[in-house]
Amino acid sequence: MSKKSGLSFLWLSAVAFVIDLLTKYIVVQKFDLYESVNVLPVFNLTYVRNYGAAFSFLADHSGWQQYFFILLALAISGMLVYFLAKNNAEQKIQNSAYALIIGGALANMVDRAYNGFVVDFFDFYWDIYHYPVFNIADIAICIGAGLLVLDAFKSEKKKVQDKQVEKCGQK
């Protein structure tokens, strides 16, 4: 009997993908560009267009970056799907991380391919200092990256514990 692979976590990619594109659609339908609605004293919903990547990286270039980021999202997503296929379903943290990154990357890729930019709308600030505006896909990618870091520390701790047990057994 074959074991279930990490591909069973792709439902999480689909959830991140759909929620991201749905929220972007709502923002585009309900907000004018740069319109901002105050939600909390440190948080606005603000419709902006990001022509670059995270923190508007490469946004001021002539347009080649759109194709670069589309290809990058496809390559990374393909690689992570391959990793999911190789992983055992019991590797829950790593599989969840990969799935969230895939969902976020593909959602931003579809947005970029369809619109030529990515819709961002979460705007956190303190006084005059604003954190770069972001979206659900960015959150999924960041949570996925954080889970990978957590998994790496967890794996390293297990290796150290296994070595200690091995040393005790040799005495």
Curated annotation (Swiss-Prot):
Function (record text): This protein specifically catalyzes the removal of signal peptides from prolipoproteins.
Subcellular location: Cell inner membrane
Transmembrane segments: 8-28, 64-84, 99-119, 133-153
Record membrane topology: Multi-pass membrane protein
Active site: 120, 138
Keyword Chloroplast listed: no
Pfam family name, one: Peptidase_A8
Record-linked NCBIfam families: lspA
Class of the enzyme per the UniProt entry, highest EC level: hydrolase
PANTHER family: LIPOPROTEIN SIGNAL PEPTIDASE
Molecular function GO terms recorded: aspartic-type endopeptidase activity; endopeptidase activity
Main location: membrane
UniProt similarity note: Belongs to the peptidase A8 family.
Superkingdom, taxonomy of origin: Bacteria
EC number: 3.4.23.36
Keywords: Aspartyl protease, Cell inner membrane, Cell membrane, Hydrolase, Membrane, Protease, Transmembrane, Transmembrane helix
Protein name (record): Lipoprotein signal peptidase
Any one GO biological process: proteolysis
Natural source organism: Haemophilus influenzae (strain ATCC 51907 / DSM 11121 / KW20 / Rd)
UniProt pathway annotation: Protein modification; lipoprotein biosynthesis (signal peptide cleavage)
Reaction(s) catalysed by this chain's protein: Release of signal peptides from bacterial membrane prolipoproteins. Hydrolyzes -Xaa-Yaa-Zaa-|-(S,diacylglyceryl)Cys-, in which Xaa is hydrophobic (preferably Leu), and Yaa (Ala or Ser) and Zaa (Gly or Ala) have small, neutral side chains
Entry GO terms, CC: plasma membrane
